[in-house]
């Protein structure tokens, strides 16, 4: 087997994904979502549609126009994250809650982080392809350093969240 062999790109669902600890499937749309972790900035939540290009290794977090041009790979479409953190929180877990006990969470994604032990709730837009926020600080879809994140905090005080599971009883 040649070490110079190039894999056929049409066999890949998505490319450019970096250090993803969390992957989940939307039970309503069947769309894939993931979390990505970076070394210095730009931790992400992504909607991973077929032929998605997350941009790694050239882009962490949202891209400017010049960066987007630098990752043009035929057959794949770069997309900015649906949300990102300026400083790393290490989003490691992502899940939809389908329990009848929590109807208020049916249109949300829960994300846990390893660095601070926070559990976040992201409310989905009507099409379930992005998030809606009340706080204008999130209009840029970034939690910038020093900005309050109260709107998205669901629970705190955990130690290094690595997974989110809903038990058979819905809890």
Task: Please give the residue ranges for each predicted region.
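Beta-propeller domain segments
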Residues: 1-153, 159-161, 169
């Amino acid at each position: 087997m040649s070490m110079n062999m190039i894999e056929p790109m049409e066999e890949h669902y998505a490319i450019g994904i970096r250090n993803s600890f969390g992957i989940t499937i939307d039970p309503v749309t069947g769309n894939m979502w993931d979390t990505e972790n970076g070394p210095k900035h730009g931790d992400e939540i992504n909607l991973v549609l077929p032929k998605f290009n997350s941009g790694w290794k050239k882009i962490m977090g949202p891209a400017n126009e010049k960066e987007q041009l630098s990752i043009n790979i035929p057959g794949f479409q770069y997309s900015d994250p649906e949300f990102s953190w300026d400083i790393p929180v290490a989003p490691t877990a992502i899940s939809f809650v389908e329990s009848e006990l929590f109807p208020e969470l049916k249109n949300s994604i829960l994300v846990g982080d390893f660095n601070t032990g926070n559990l976040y709730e992201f409310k989905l837009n009507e099409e379930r392809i992005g998030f809606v926020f009340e706080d204008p600080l999130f209009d840029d879809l970034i939690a910038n350093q020093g900005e309050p994140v109260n709107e998205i905090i669901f629970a705190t005080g955990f130690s290094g969240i690595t997974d989110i599971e809903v038990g058979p009883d819905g809890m």
